[in-house]
Amino acid sequence: MTHVLSAVAWPYANGPRHIGHVAGFGVPSDVFSRYMRMAGHDVLMVSGTDEHGTPILVQAEQEGLTPQQLADRYNRVIAEDLHGLGLSYDLFTRTTTANHYAVVQEMFRTVHRNGYMVARKGMGAISPSTGRTLPDRYVEGTCPICGYDGARGDQCDNCGNQLDAIELKNPRSRINGETPVFVETEHFYLDLPALAEALGSWLQTRADTGRWRPNVLKFSQNLLADMKPRAMTRDIDWGIPVPLEGWEDNPAKRLYVWFDAVIGYLSASVEWARRSGDDDAWKAWWTDPAAESYYFMGKDNITFHSQIWPAELLAYDGRGSAGGQPGPFGNLNLPTEVVASEFLTMEGKQFSSSRGVVIYVRDVLARYQPDALRYFISAAGPENNDSDFTWQEFATRTNSELVAGWGNLVNRTASLIAKNVGEIPAAGELTDADRDLLATTSGGFSTVGGFIEAHRQRAGIGEAMRVVGEVNKYLTEQEPWKIKNSDPERMKSVLHVTAQAVSDCRTLLSPFLPHSAQKVHQAFGGVGTVSPLPELREVTDLDDGRPYPVLTGDYRRGETLPEWASHPVVPGTPVAAPTPVFTKLDVAAVVEEELGRLQR
């Protein structure tokens, strides 16, 4: 058994999540976490809403709310979205907890004490019309590296490089379009050059494993070529105070949102441990060198997870050129793998809430089954290349693959057993065809599991559905309905073998399709939970008593979760006439209705 940290990118609390978001961080992390638990590993899956930074400050001002009120609203909305999708977080929390503030400030103090956080003067943007500081995310212009017109003052989303606002060509305010004025200001900078050698050594060990996705590895290696100090504080009054004398009482200086957000993986683990009753439980995932950690996100966040976060960890541990000693958390593990997906587009266009090119998770879940969306993302998502979501393909895949493939196999098998036997029959003497089929389904555990562990989920679900096709083919060729009277014992053997094969397929598909896995289990007389879903729970802050919702759950293997293996079906288990597992869609109606919504 290995302790496996599943660190899931923190959705920003400025609105509901759209399907492009969950295609990058949500479904891939959940499929991996569910499989790893079933395979016997001790998984801790953590995340939460990212609630600091300029966008929330500006949006709250526009809506007549405080930043905390806006964060409270969307913390709940996002938690509900992810709950509906069935993402099995051990803890989904938020970055405005007192616990998170304490962990972040401790990280900053130690990084500063070790000599990797250096105060220096730089240039900050000011709005000429208001005289107020214009945070870097609200300055845009032409990227000096790739020439993209629309780069932000902290990062270019086109090439992924980090920037300073003053580096942009033709800078302008995203709020009112005016040209900002740049004035001198003082900030703390993370000394990346002092950490460059250690970062390069770590990244080389990752490259040597041969496991990282080529695009992620290449991008991360390219970052090493331009290592310069990066500002980790901002001129803003919404965020975590700088925990140093002379700075912490300054209302206009706060820690950079990306400095604090990535520390959330650690603070969420600490909060989970505190809520579990063992304050030190988090250490098994963070300080044990044998533990593994996998970070899931979209490709626009690679920089922060393969450069900034490892640099913070190295600086905290004192492993850069300036030396130093770890703080009270001890030596913290560096990421095992950064699992970044490409982008999902919609009907050939980039997602854009402001332009109405968006499909929110909550809207999909209100009209369609959650496993239909999970299936599309798993089978056709942006794993190694950008992919496009169309309503035509979504509805067609739902009908031809889920309904006509997997759902049809479940329904016809349960119906045949219910009609002809009423219970799972015992098997008589098996034929070569029977043994071949059972070898195919049992062999799927190694193949599908290997694909999931290698973050090749499209191949994994494709192989699982290929096995489903083999079972459907077997049932059609054996024609048990024709031999009820002439050879009832053979009919029972065929139905037993098919029931066993369906059980195996259910397990193979359960990391991808947890909602329907439970339905299939119950359709064949199963009791108890085989595919646990998360709980949306109301809690209070452990330190200041403020209420907020979290996602959590009980995902213990052997108690609520089966082992990743074939489980013998039990003869005599009653089987009643089933109800369809999946809902067939009217493809033309879905396309017309959904495209009409986009145009309204």
From Swiss-Prot:
A motif ('KMSKS' region) lies at residues 350-354. A motif ('HIGH' region) lies at residues 11-21. This is Methionine--tRNA ligase. ATP binds at S353. GO terms for molecular function: ATP binding; metal ion binding; methionine-tRNA ligase activity. Is required not only for elongation of protein synthesis but also for the initiation of all mRNA translation through initiator tRNA(fMet) aminoacylation. Its cofactor is Zn(2+). Zn(2+) binds at C143, C146, C156, C159. PANTHER family: METHIONINE--TRNA LIGASE, METHIONINE--TRNA LIGASE, CYTOPLASMIC. Its main location: cytoplasm. It catalyses: tRNA(Met) + L-methionine + ATP = L-methionyl-tRNA(Met) + AMP + diphosphate. Binds 1 zinc ion per subunit. It comes from Kineococcus radiotolerans (strain ATCC BAA-149 / DSM 14245 / SRS30216). GO terms for cellular component: cytosol. GO terms for biological process: methionyl-tRNA aminoacylation. CDD domains: Anticodon_Ia_Met (cd07957), MetRS_core (cd00814). The keyword Aminoacyl-tRNA synthetase applies.
